[in-house]
């Protein structure tokens, strides 16, 4: 039996497009809720974990508030390309675990799908604490739910429900070496988030 590579990659492409469309749908629904609850106009905003990509699959908040006059992007990548989306954007190259910014610098600190990539549980706790430290009032952190049926990073269903050590071994076996390492992917559940927030003595929060 021979593999028709053209048909194979066409199917892979169709599957990728399906996942992207589903992810966009759910992400848009989440931001609908966020914009109903939080006023962004006239606020000083920091986006932690921006990526150097103009596709609206990335940097969701920046795409949705293009007219905002005070938005800063902090990333360990060079994100100067994002000025094409909004010339008012200020770019800072830095580390979300230690931003070196002053306390209470921003009205809103936002981070989308970054916390699952900062590494260990300790690092994830530190990431939350740092976002809280530099925000005057509001912190928004989005991350995929570990117990959603499909992991959107690997496109593999269900195996991420398993204990993390077993999950990582299976990722190696499926040639997902990058995501098999904790420093590159450490998925969180709703209970994980609650636990981290309680560790930071945060009582006023919503998870949705």
Where on the chain are the PLM-derived regions?
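Class I SAM-dependent methyltransferase Rossmann-like catalytic core
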Residues: 1-39
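Short glycine/proline- and acidic residue-enriched helix-loop micro-motifs
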Residues: 15-17, 173-183
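Soluble or luminal CAZymes and related metallo-dependent hydrolases
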Residues: 22-30, 123, 185-192
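Active-site phosphate/pyrophosphate- and oxyanion-stabilizing loops and adjacent acidic/basic residues
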Residues: 32, 129, 191-195
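Conserved SAM-binding loop
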Residues: 37-38, 43-148
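Conserved class I S-adenosyl-L-methionine
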Residues: 138-167
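Short alpha-helix
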Residues: 178-201
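Conserved S-adenosyl-L-methionine
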Residues: 202-208
């Amino acid at each position: 039996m021979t593999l028709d590579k053209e048909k194979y990659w066409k199917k892979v492409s169709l599957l990728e497009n399906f996942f992207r469309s589903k992810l966009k749908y759910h992400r848009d629904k989440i931001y609908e809720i966020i914009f109903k609850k939080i006023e962004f106009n006239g606020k000083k905003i920091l986006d932690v974990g921006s990526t150097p990509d103009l596709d609206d699959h990335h940097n969701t908040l920046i795409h949705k508030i293009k007219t905002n006059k005070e938005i800063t992007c902090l990333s360990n990548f060079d994100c100067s390309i994002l000025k094409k989306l909004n010339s008012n954007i200020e770019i800072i190259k830095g580390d979300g675990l230690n931003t070196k910014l002053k306390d209470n610098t921003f009205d809103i600190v936002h981070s989308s799908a970054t916390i699952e990539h900062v590494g260990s549980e300790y690092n994830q706790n530190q990431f939350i604490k740092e976002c809280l430290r530099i925000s005057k009032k509001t912190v928004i952190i989005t991350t995929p739910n570990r117990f959603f049926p499909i992991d959107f990073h690997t496109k593999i269903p269900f195996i991420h429900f398993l204990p993390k050590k077993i999950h990582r071994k299976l990722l190696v076996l499926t040639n997902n070496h990058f995501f098999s390492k904790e420093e590159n992917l450490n998925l969180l559940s709703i209970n994980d988030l609650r636990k981290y927030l309680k560790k930071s003595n945060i009582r006023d929060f919503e998870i949705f």
